């Protein structure tokens, strides 16, 4: 009986074989909405495809999703082609997606809008990064297909308008899987060679044929270029990501040639106009100054130069006399000022000030000595007075008047007869020595200080 029971693994493998062998499940075309989208670090995409009533788990491996031209997002309606199989580890069926595109909008357009929005947020289209196109370029790089009509239009236009310009063509692929790398690499190479301007473009075509100029790799190369870049992709109605990133957008390759260089004919016309303007201004200048010269010739100075010289000589003599008088007066005034300053300096001579300072210092020194002597005298008298006061209470001075201090055998001062006994040995310290004796009698004084009874 036990042999009738299957393991979970065996059952799951059986169901998987059944589903894998069903031709209807091997090629599924499915419409639904994306939810729970997750792009794993290994490159695989995990998501749920749902409608109003049901949902199914799905996975799109990196080998398939790297071909997508748009970035899947939650809430996006998509058209899917894939197959149904069982994920054995969880025992659940899921959809393995091989192809996917937006539902209701082309995948290329979806990819274009997504990249456009992302680069716009990153500042790729900002005017602050746009570089000016030089007015008179000497060296121009053209990055395009060497065989298309675009290169002929660009070269013909520039050589016709500005024959002196030097043009270098960088041949690239402009469509196909390898085109974006070819274009980006040539932009970087041309930028490193210090051209004045770079033209990047191609002739018209479908959106698929122009798609290389909508790739992020090409947009990044244009944005990072230090050389000004003119984008010239397709016709006037065609708009690519490269047009938004470039420093200047030309509606056609022919227009790119016109925008890149000035017209030599127009320059020559401007030069001719400026020459005529300069000649006219020069003629006016000469005419004006001839009039001024004629007016000067009619003045008194030109008509009567000798009289004018004599008049000026008299004015000069008068001026010289006035100058001499003023100089003498100035010298006299300066002399008086000088004498006055000498007197002031003499009264304020440093030696005089020094003598006054020395006299004042001597006076201060004498006053200081006098005050110090007075202070010492006062302190000496105060000291002697304190010594006299101390002498009055000095025990030695008291003993000189006939008093003595008694001590017992232990050297302690005897202050009362109560501390003595008959036959005690005592020492009497007098002014000029000591006396040893024995107690033979003890009399205690009464309250009046008179002798009392024997103890």
Curated annotation (Swiss-Prot):
InterPro entries: Exonuc_VII_L, Exonuc_VII_lsu_C, OB-fold_nuc-bd_dom. GO terms for biological process: DNA catabolic process. GO terms for cellular component: cytoplasm; exodeoxyribonuclease VII complex. It catalyses: Exonucleolytic cleavage in either 5'- to 3'- or 3'- to 5'-direction to yield nucleoside 5'-phosphates. Its main location: cytoplasm. Its EC number is 3.1.11.6. It is found in: Cytoplasm. It is an enzyme of class 3 (hydrolase). Keywords: Cytoplasm, Exonuclease, Hydrolase, Nuclease. GO terms for molecular function: exodeoxyribonuclease VII activity; nucleic acid binding. Bidirectionally degrades single-stranded DNA into large acid-insoluble oligonucleotides, which are then degraded further into small acid-soluble oligonucleotides. Heterooligomer composed of large and small subunits. Belongs to the XseA family. This is Exodeoxyribonuclease 7 large subunit. It comes from Oceanobacillus iheyensis (strain DSM 14371 / CIP 107618 / JCM 11309 / KCTC 3954 / HTE831). The gene is xseA.
């Amino acid at each position: 009986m036990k042999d009738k029971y299957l393991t979970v693994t065996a059952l799951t493998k059986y169901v998987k074989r059944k589903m894998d062998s069903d031709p209807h499940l091997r090629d599924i075309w499915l419409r639904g909405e994306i939810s729970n989208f997750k792009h794993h670090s290994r490159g695989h995409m995990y998501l749920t495809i749902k409608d109003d009533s049901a949902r199914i788990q799905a996975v799109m491996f990196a080998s398939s999703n790297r071909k997508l031209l748009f970035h899947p997002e939650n809430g996006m309606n998509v058209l899917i082609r894939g197959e149904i199989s069982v994920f054995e580890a969880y025992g659940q069926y899921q959809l393995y997606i091989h192809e996917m595109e937006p539902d209701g909008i082309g995948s290329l357009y979806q990819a274009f809008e997504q990249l456009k929005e992302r680069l716009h947020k990153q500042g790729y289209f900002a005017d602050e990064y746009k570089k000016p196109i030089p007015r008179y370029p000497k060296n121009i790089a053209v990055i395009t297909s060497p065989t298309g009509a675009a290169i002929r239009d660009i070269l013909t236009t520039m050589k016709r308008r500005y024959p002196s310009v030097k043009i270098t063509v960088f041949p690239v692929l402009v469509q196909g899987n390898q085109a974006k790398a070819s274009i980006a690499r040539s932009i970087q190479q041309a930028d490193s060679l210090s051209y004045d301007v770079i033209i990047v473009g191609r002739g018209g075509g479908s959106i698929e044929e122009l798609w290389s100029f909508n790739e992020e790799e090409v947009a990044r190369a244009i944005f990072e270029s230090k050389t000004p870049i003119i984008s010239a992709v397709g016709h006037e109605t065609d708009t690519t990501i490269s047009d938004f990133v470039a420093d200047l957008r030309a509606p056609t390759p022919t227009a790119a040639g016109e925008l890149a260089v000035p017209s030599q004919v127009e320059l020559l016309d401007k030069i001719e106009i400026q020459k005529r303007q300069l000649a006219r201004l020069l003629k006016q200048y000469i005419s004006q100054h001839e009039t001024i010269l004629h007016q000067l010739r009619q003045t008194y100075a030109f008509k009567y130069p000798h009289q004018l010289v004599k008049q000026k000589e008299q004015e000069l003599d008068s001026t010289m006399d006035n100058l001499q008088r003023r100089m003498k007066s100035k010298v006299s005034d300066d002399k008086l000022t000088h004498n006055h300053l000498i007197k002031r300096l003499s009264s304020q001579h440093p030696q005089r000030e020094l003598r006054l300072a020395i006299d004042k210092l001597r006076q201060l020194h004498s006053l200081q000595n006098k005050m110090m002597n007075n202070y010492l005298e006062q302190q000496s008298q105060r000291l002697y007075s304190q010594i006299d006061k101390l002498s009055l209470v000095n025990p030695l001075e008291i003993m000189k008047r006939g008093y003595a201090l008694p001590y017992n055998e232990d050297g302690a001062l005897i202050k009362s007869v109560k501390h003595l006994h008959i036959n005690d040995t005592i020492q009497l310290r007098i002014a000029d020595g000591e006396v040893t004796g024995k107690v033979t009698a003890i009399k205690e004084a009464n309250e009046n200080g008179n002798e009392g009874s024997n103890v």
